[in-house]
């Protein structure tokens, strides 16, 4: 394009020279018209050149850098509360500000014996809670979640309505049952006491065993003498 402009510039200068020398009106009018034509063409060429330069400059600009949305690390939720009605087991999770995040940022997936909660990008963090081995089966279709002020409420629909859950999970049930005394509370109280003493004796050290043996001998001697204070 620079070469074309240069040629037009030379044509314009030559027309100007001829126009200065021309004396006849018809010739001068023709040269004046040609001069205007060349000037207009030069103006258009220059505008096109400027436009292309601007486009090249715009294309050379670096693309805007969009900062990635980070959700930080994931916090495992361990604190929660739960209760139940005839139809639902209700799990309450307290998360300050959770009601302010977009609805799609709070996700809960259900299976017949589990659920998992994921809250994304809450104050720069994600929060996760996975509960497996629910005590009893739940209805996946009938289960849901609700987001309230600073709280996520998970509603697990009982498959068998009007049944009571003593524990939330099977694991919790097994742990609690292991903590119960080994003797049967429905048996005779004296038998239960003997079982307790037997367990203490088996688990105790030598001093404990000597103490129990001594108490046992003294008790037997008193019973032989008719003393029933023991």
Swiss-Prot record:
Pfam families: CS, SGS, Siah-Interact_N. GO terms for molecular function: S100 protein binding; tubulin binding; ubiquitin protein ligase binding. One of its GO terms (biological process) is heart development. Residues 38-59 are annotated as: Disordered. Phosphorylated on serine residues. Phosphorylated upon induction by RA or at high calcium concentrations. The modification N6-acetyllysine is found at residues 10, 21, 87, 120. Keywords: Acetylation, Cytoplasm, Nucleus, Phosphoprotein, Ubl conjugation pathway. It is found in: Nucleus; Cytoplasm. Residues 156-230 are annotated as: Interaction with S100A6. SUPFAM superfamilies: Calcyclin-binding protein-like, HSP20-like chaperones. CDD domains: p23_CacyBP (cd06468). Monomer or homodimer. Component of some large E3 complex at least composed of UBE2D1, SIAH1, CACYBP/SIP, SKP1, APC and TBL1X. Interacts directly with SIAH1, SIAH2 and SKP1. Interacts with proteins of the S100 family S100A1, S100A6, S100B, S100P and S100A12 in a calcium-dependent manner. PANTHER family: CALCYCLIN-BINDING PROTEIN, CALICYLIN BINDING PROTEIN. This is Calcyclin-binding protein. It comes from Bos taurus (Bovine). The lineage of its organism: Eukaryota, Metazoa, Chordata, Craniata, Vertebrata.
């Amino acid at each position: 394009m620079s070469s074309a402009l240069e040629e037009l510039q030379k044509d314009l200068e030559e027309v100007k020279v001829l126009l200065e020398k021309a004396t006849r009106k018809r010739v001068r009018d023709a040269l004046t018209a040609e001069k205007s034509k060349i000037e207009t063409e030069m103006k258009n060429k220059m505008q096109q050149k400027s436009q292309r330069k601007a486009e090249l400059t715009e294309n050379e600009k670096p693309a805007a850098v969009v900062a990635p949305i980070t959700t930080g690390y994931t916090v495992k939720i361990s604190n929660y509360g739960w209760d139940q009605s005839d139809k639902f087991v209700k799990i309450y999770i307290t998360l300050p500000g959770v009601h302010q995040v977009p609805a799609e940022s709070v996700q809960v997936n259900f299976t017949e014996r589990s659920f998992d909660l994921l809250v994304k990008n809450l104050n720069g963090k994600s929060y996760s809670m996975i509960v497996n081995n629910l005590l009893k089966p739940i209805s996946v279709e009938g289960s849901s979640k609700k987001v309230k002020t600073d709280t996520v409420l998970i509603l697990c629909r009982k498959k068998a309505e009007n049944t009571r859950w003593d524990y939330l999970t099977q694991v919790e049930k097994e742990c609690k049952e292991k903590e119960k005394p080994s003797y049967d509370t429905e048996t005779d109280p004296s038998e239960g006491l003997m079982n307790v003493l037997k367990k203490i004796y088996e688990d105790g050290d030598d001093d404990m065993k000597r103490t129990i043996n001594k108490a046992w001998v003294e008790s037997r001697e008193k019973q032989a003498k008719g003393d029933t204070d023991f």
